[in-house]
Each structure stands twice: as structure tokens, then as C-alpha cells.
From Swiss-Prot:
Recorded name of the encoding gene: psd
Pfam families found in the cross-reference section: PS_Dcarbxylase
Pathway(s) of this molecule: Phospholipid metabolism; phosphatidylethanolamine biosynthesis; phosphatidylethanolamine from CDP-diacylglycerol: step 2/2
Catalytic activity entry: a 1,2-diacyl-sn-glycero-3-phospho-L-serine + H(+) = a 1,2-diacyl-sn-glycero-3-phosphoethanolamine + CO2
UniProt organism field: Pseudoalteromonas atlantica (strain T6c / ATCC BAA-1087)
Family membership: Belongs to the phosphatidylserine decarboxylase family. PSD-B subfamily. Prokaryotic type I sub-subfamily.
Protein name (database record): Phosphatidylserine decarboxylase proenzyme
């Protein structure tokens, strides 16, 4: 009963307004008040600050600085084997498996459209039909930067406006088409073995989504789908190596990774399993 009420409230609350207000508060530099809030957050969510580049909460001028904190260089090891893809985030597996033509599994009783996920762009979705997908949820305690599973040349980025439902496991079970409804940023890469899509999905109180090449993408792009294309050479070209930072969430969310058919086999993960940046995510089949 309580779960049903929580979901119902998400449909009627002004999620965008709340998220933007929280974003402004998280960006505020309020001295001791900011430090106090950070300490409360660390205690509430049991954040491991021993891994952080800056361990002292007082060293962060804003909550956003803390939330997108860097880790120490030796805190994560990127799997070295060239055949292995690196887990792109700390988090927990929501779902992973086969893309069945244009359909991605969300939770029991709920699938959603690959094409819709990628911004309603059939020309981008075609490469991934009957391929593989993995959805990973980042909880509040997690490190919130996203890294590359493998080397890739950026070809396309799509901003897709949408809702800002929570992306918690409960919401994934109850809200149809959740990841294809929420605001998101899609990045398409050419890799040595085929195409890879990395989809950064927004959520309630996610103040912004950033990429290393474009900075803040959301907000304030607007209410229309926006599609950027990138060259393979020149000053606007973007090439990222395995383990490089791709982007970050300010206040947490979910990533969906998609791969071409016959390109990868996932490591032994199941729904609910914890993930750690740099561990073996998948192995190339070619």
C-alpha cells in the first residue's frame, strides 16, 4: 500500500521544479552549513570517504563538489585485458541481457523501446537491435562519475527531454517505460569492435547531466530532442580510452549501455548485484 502511494505521488509532484530547486541548493556555497549537510549525508548513506581524493568534508565548497567527488588514483583498477570491457560505474545491476529486436527488459511485466530510449532516432537504434544491454543504478552513496568500458570515438550525442521519475528499483518495477520516459543524454561511440551506446538517464533531484566534451547538457537544453554529430578528426573530434571519464551525474541516477549483436558477452552478473568501476563488465566475442 505504502509503495503504491509513493509511486502515485511521483505522477503528481512537480518533479522538474523540485529537481531544479535542489540543484540550486546543491550548487550553493554555504560554508559551515554545506559542510554540516555533507557530514549528515556521509553518515546517512555510509559513504566511504577513505576512497575520495579529498577525504575531509570541509574541503568541498558545495554539495555538488562533494557529490561528484574524484576518487584516489588507486581506489579503482581498470581491468587491463584488451578483450575485457570495464564496468563503467559503481552501482547495482538493474537488468541486463538481450535486446529483443527493439525491446529492452525493464522489470517483470515492463519492456520499453530501444528506439525511444535513443531519442526516437531509428538510424541510431538499428545497429543495436538484437544486441545486448545492461542497466546499472547508481545509489546516493555511490561514486557518480561514469567511465568508458572500452576505447571509443564519439559520433553522436542526443539530448532527450522527459520526465524525472525516481529510478529506484521500486520505480523500475512500477512505472512502465521508465528509462525511455525520463530525461536523458545518449552518447554513441564507434569502437574497434562495433558501436556502443551509453545512455545517462536523469531522475528526481538529479540537478544535471554532464559530459566531458560538452559540459552541462541538462538543463537547460529545452523541450525538444537535440542531436549533435561529431567528426572523427579535427578539434571537435572526441576520442576516449577505456577507463576515461565520460560524464557525471549531480545527484545520482542510472546508465544504460547497449552493444551491437555478437559483440560482447557479459560477465556473471544478475539483477541486484553490486558493481565496481573497473571490474570486468563484459568480454568481446570477436
Amino acid at each position: 500500500m505504502f509503495d503504491s502511494i509513493k509511486i502515485a505521488l511521483q505522477y503528481i509532484t512537480p518533479k522538474h521544479l523540485i529537481s531544479r530547486l535542489v540543484g540550486k541548493l546543491a550548487a550553493a556555497k554555504a560554508g559551515g552549513l554545506t559542510t554540516g549537510l555533507i557530514k549528515l549525508f556521509i553518515k546517512q548513506y555510509k559513504v566511504n570517504m577513505a576512497e575520495a581524493e579529498r577525504e575531509n568534508p570541509a574541503d568541498y565548497a558545495s554539495f555538488n563538489e562533494f557529490f561528484t567527488r574524484a576518487l584516489k588514483d588507486d581506489a579503482r583498477v581498470i581491468c587491463p585485458n584488451e578483450q575485457d570491457l570495464a564496468m563503467p560505474v559503481d552501482g547495482a545491476v538493474s537488468q541486463l541481457g538481450d535486446i529483443k529486436h527493439d525491446s529492452i527488459f525493464q522489470a517483470k511485466g515492463h519492456d520499453y523501446s530501444l528506439t525511444t530510449l535513443l531519442g526516437g532516432k531509428p538510424e541510431l537504434a538499428t545497429a543495436f537491435k538484437n544486441g545486448k544491454f545492461a542497466t546499472v543504478y547508481l545509489s546516493p552513496k555511490d561514486y557518480h562519475r561514469i567511465h568508458m568500458p572500452m576505447d571509443g570515438q564519439l559520433t553522436d550525442m542526443v539530448y532527450v527531454p522527459g520526465e524525472l521519475f525516481s529510478v529506484s528499483p521500486l520505480t523500475a518495477e512500477r512505472v512502465p517505460g521508465l528509462f525511455a520516459r525520463n530525461e536523458r543524454v545518449v552518447a554513441i561511440f564507434d569502437t574497434p569492435k562495433g558501436k556502443m551506446a551509453m545512455v545517462l538517464v536523469g531522475a528526481t533531484i538529479v540537478a544535471s547531466i554532464e559530459t566531458v566534451w560538452a559540459g552541462t547538457v541538462s538543463p537547460p537544453v529545452g523541450k525538444n530532442v537535440v542531436h549533435w554529430q561529431y567528426p572523427s578528426e579535427g578539434e571537435d573530434a572526441v576520442f576516449l580510452k577505456k577507463g576515461d571519464e565520460l560524464g557525471r551525474f549531480k545527484l545520482g541516477s542510472t546508465i544504460v549501455a547497449c552493444f551491437e549483436p555478437d559483440m560482447v558477452e557479459f560477465a556473471d552478473y544478475s539483477a541486484g548485484d553490486d558493481t565496481r568501476l573497473g571490474d570486468v563488465f563484459a568480454t568481446l566475442t570477436q
